Amino acid sequence: MCGIFGGVGVNVEDARRCLDNIRRGDDGITVKQFDDVVIGARRHLVKTSDKPGVVLGESDQPYGSDDGKVQMVLNGELYTFKEIRDSLAGRGHTFTSTGDTEVFLRLYEEEGKNFVKNEMIDSLFAIAILDQRSNELIITRDWPGRIPLFYYYDPANRVFLFSSELKGIREVNWVPLDDVVELTPGDIATLDLETFELNIQPYFRPTPVKTENGIMEIGAKLNDLLKISAHNRTMGDVPICVMFSGGIDSLLTSFYVLNSIDFSSVDYKPTGYVFAVEGFESEDVRRAKVAADGFKDIGFELKEIRSPRSTMVEDIPDVVATFETRKIKALSVYPLPIYYYLAPEMRKDGFKVTIGGHGVDELLGAYDAWKELTASHKVQTNVKSRLKFMANIYENMLRRASIIFMNRGPIEARFPFLQPDVCEYMLGIDARWLNISADNAETLARLMEDRGGPQDSWTDQMCDIHGYLTRYLDGGGEHPEDADEETRYEMEKLFWKLPMIVAGMKASQESFLPVDVLFNAKLRGQHGAGITDLETDIVNRFANLGNSDGEIFQNVVNQAFRLKSA
């Protein structure tokens, strides 16, 4: 993971100043100029490249073809670089380094702009390529947008700039930041350097993989896909930690990743982080501690990070500005402090990569209604709604994970659930498997009985869930009459992620994962961490910026990025 910047209309000094402001790594900056095109990178080293001639304190990018006619910079990681490298070597390509950027470069030389469609690629990336043979400057980014990539295009003045972050282009003070565009994930943009025409084409959009299989087969397949995705995301030469809030998303992500690492051969121990407001009785922390106990056999350490309310309120303007979302919603802001405060602690402990369970709520339509999000669960589980969630995930969840973690660490974030094969499979899961019903309740109750071990060893939570399911089934698939609304809702939410529970059941048969931790249900993170309780304090403290939290956040962004509405 790095920061990239370049284009036409700036010089080397401008580009270096812009890269200085991106803050996506502290392992060196290099900028080079080729005629009127400038291209540069800021390095966050997670895997050594052994590239000859790299000067200490500089990035190893850009990478050039043997004749120097093609130059590439990469922000990201190519998890399957070894397999692709071997394939290219078999086709006659030679390599001067052991890193993944050169593999992308050789793949481009072999396949041209279609290289992004290569099915062997498992990667998060934003890439810029200067091809002097075709006289083109090309930029592209992964789907669903795990790496940000912005551009500014002014053909009348022959200006085209690209940047990993809006803060980079902000350093070019004559650029109107309202006119900077974020490249859509799964698109590739080609600038003809002779005509200065810009052509943008999609190269990938997800196609849900529909299946007629039952929930047991679905869970088994999901388990297989997640094992592969998680294993790939352990690539690198640096310590890896996990985000661990205690819910099933972070629980399974942590399991699949940590189960892929041989801790006897590395010099760090399995570590997870959970955040909450200081003094808040956090459901996140309580659930995380319960879940962490299920990982004790591998020596797992859970670190609880807290921050005072007053500090968090004072930091909100910087938190919002770091997020650099120009049309911001209050819904998007309250999760941000988790990343803002975790990143420095992770880095202080020696980590450079973290793993998160991001994407599950979007893939399965499993959001609680809150703030601007009001769609019912039935609407959310519609495939069209889930595709729409995924189309927009880069503007919110992925931006905060990538930009805030990198700016505050730098920490690179990786997401096993957002591997395209995993996404397409989960998007294809029929909505009938995402709701409570008599059939689903019977399946889950039977699984608990068959795989949960002796019932006298079950946790109270697991006993309560099984007891509720028994009463639900005895009532003909209806909630017990004496169950209050909150209990009914929590039981319904359990089934929103039934495929995950079944996948976890399969994983528990193959590993150390205890079945009971799969039933550690909880509310979503920012609520359980106590951050939403800060709303009144924020509105009172920054009343000069607006009458509501949403208005305050928008005005902070307007001022930070010279927006016309400021």
Segments predicted by a language model, with ranges:
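ATP-dependent adenylate-handling active sites, centered on carboxylate activation for C-N bond formation
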Residues: 8-13, 90, 133-135, 146-149, ...
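Conserved S-adenosyl-L-methionine
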Residues: 202-203, 438, 514-524
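Cysteine-centered catalytic environments shared across enzyme families
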Residues: 1-310, 318-322
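Short alpha-helical segments used as structural interaction elements across diverse proteins
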Residues: 40, 494, 519-521
